[in-house]
UniProtKB/Swiss-Prot annotation:
CDD domains: IPPase. One of its GO terms (molecular function) is inositol-1,3,4-trisphosphate 1-phosphatase activity. It is an enzyme of class 3 (hydrolase). Monomer. Li(+) binds at D54, E80. It comes from the Eukaryota. The modification Phosphoserine is found at S314. One of its GO terms (biological process) is phosphatidylinositol phosphate biosynthetic process. Mg(2+)-dependent phosphatase that catalyzes the hydrolysis of the 1-position phosphate from inositol 1,4-bisphosphate and inositol 1,3,4-trisphosphate and participates in inositol phosphate metabolism. This is Inositol polyphosphate 1-phosphatase. InterPro entries: CysQ/Inositol_MonoPase (IPR050725), Inositol_monoP_metal-BS (IPR020583), Inositol_monophosphatase-like (IPR000760), Inositol_monophosphatase_CS (IPR020550), INPP1_dom_1 (IPR044897). Inhibited by Li(+). It comes from Mus musculus (Mouse).
Length: 396
């Protein structure tokens, strides 16, 4: 199984290279944007966009997984269809070709004959990426490939990607908007149980060199399977743990909470959160990025009461958080159940469609979500949130 995760790290980095390449040329970037229509449209945004970068990234992930693990590429699911319409109204199916030249030829149809741009993109698509991790290479875990499914969000926070703001200031390490909020999300789940098993989050625009204006990325991963829990932040955490263990156990129950939220969150939730968290409520763009803030320890909780996140938004982060001892739960179910029932938390699952839905809504996280790293912190947070929501709690 670690061989799959190693391959996902490599394809996520190739995907990040594509995302960066598409942004570096403004004229090229304008060509790549196409508005999403019909059943594909995410109802949260007035104008949602499909970019060729989105489609290319998803196809690269599919093709690479299929080449390395035959059959697995067919079980890569995501938000994007690989059909693109050019300015002449021609529908083009975007697929990786066997050679760089053939891929460039296909891309030139999408890009209205712009061969230099097509060749530049094809080069990045066919470039080999070698990303290794000694921890993963030494891990020996076996799981049949046929029992796995993969959720992909090729470019989460497409709006921030298109807008391309590079000079947004962070608030206590959390960026409210900007390219830092863009993530590539790859989550692996069990087709039978729906549990998330492996996750990769690649942040292509983590930091910018102010001299060269080049962007550097950062990659995070986690694996949670049959009692094995391992993640990329383990070394960083274990170094500080020995010094702060007592302090952390006290903090579980005493200190204020911090939460990261969507700018579109309901006023009732915002008001309750301000009573629970005081001034430590941070708005930020992108479901993937907000989950990453919890993974990084920048916030205790990511909470979202709406039904406009999807399985591809949450699966990768959920797997990493499980490896850390946390998870992502259904917010509505959490607020409706009695805390003293002793029931397991309603973790999000990834294998069952929503009944009666169509299009992307088949895979919406209908009850909203709460992402967390610490179960103890979550329990305390939930009891305080319920107290502060009062009678409106079941409407979330």
């Amino acid at each position: 199984m670690s061989d799959i995760l190693l391959e996902l790290l490599c394809v996520s980095e190739k995907a990040a290279n594509i995302a960066r390449a598409c942004r570096q040329q403004e004229t090229l970037f304008q060509l790549l944007i196409e508005e999403k229509k019909g059943a594909e449209k995410n109802k949260k945004f007035a104008a949602d966009f499909k970019t060729l970068a989105d489609v290319l990234v998803q196809e690269v992930i599919k093709q690479n997984m299929e080449n390395k693990f035959p059959g697995l590429g067919k079980k890569v699911f995501g938000e994007e269809s690989n059909e693109f319409t050019n300015d002449l109204g021609e529908k083009i199916t975007v697929e990786l070709q066997s050679t760089e030249e053939e891929t460039a030829e296909l891309l030139s149809k999408v890009l209205n004959g712009n061969m230099p741009a097509s060749e530049a993109l094809a080069q990045v698509v066919h470039e080999d990426v070698d990303l290794t991790d000694p921890t993963l290479e030494s891990l020996d875990i076996s799981i049949p490939h046929e029992s796995l499914g993969i959720w992909v969000d090729p470019i989460d926070s497409t709006y921030q990607y298109i807008k391309g703001s590079a000079n947004v200031k962070s608030n206590q390490g959390i960026f409210p908007s900007g390219l830092q909020c863009v993530t590539i999300l790859i989550g692996v789940y069990d087709l039978q149980t729906g549990l998330p098993l492996m996750g990769v989050i690649n942040q292509p625009f983590a930091s910018q060199n102010l001299t060269t204006l080049r962007w550097k990325g950062q990659c995070y991963w986690g694996l949670s399977y049959m009692g094995t829990n391992i993640h990329s932040l383990q070394l960083a955490i274990s170094k500080s743990d020995s010094e702060t263990q007592t302090e952390n156990s006290d903090r579980e129950f005493s200190s204020p909470f911090s939460a990261v939220i969507s700018t579109s969150e309901k006023d009732t939730i915002k008001a309750a959160l301000s009573r629970v968290c005081g001034g430590s409520v941070f708005p930020a763009a992108g479901a993937g990025y907000k989950s990453l803030c919890v993974i990084q320890g920048l916030a205790d909780i990511y909470i979202f009461s709406e039904d406009t996140t999807y399985k591809w938004d949450s699966c990768a982060a959920h797997a990493i958080l499980r490896a850390m001892g946390g998870g992502i739960v259904d917010m509505k179910e959490c607020l409706e159940r009695s805390p003293d029932t002793g029931l397991d938390l309603p973790q999000l699952l990834y294998h069952v469609e929503n009944k009666g839905a169509s299009g992307v809504e088949l895979w919406a996280n209908k009850g909203g979500l709460i992402a967390y790293r610490s179960r103890n912190r979550l329990d305390t947070f939930l009891s305080r949130l319920i107290q502060n929501l009062g009678p409106v709690k079941t409407q979330a």
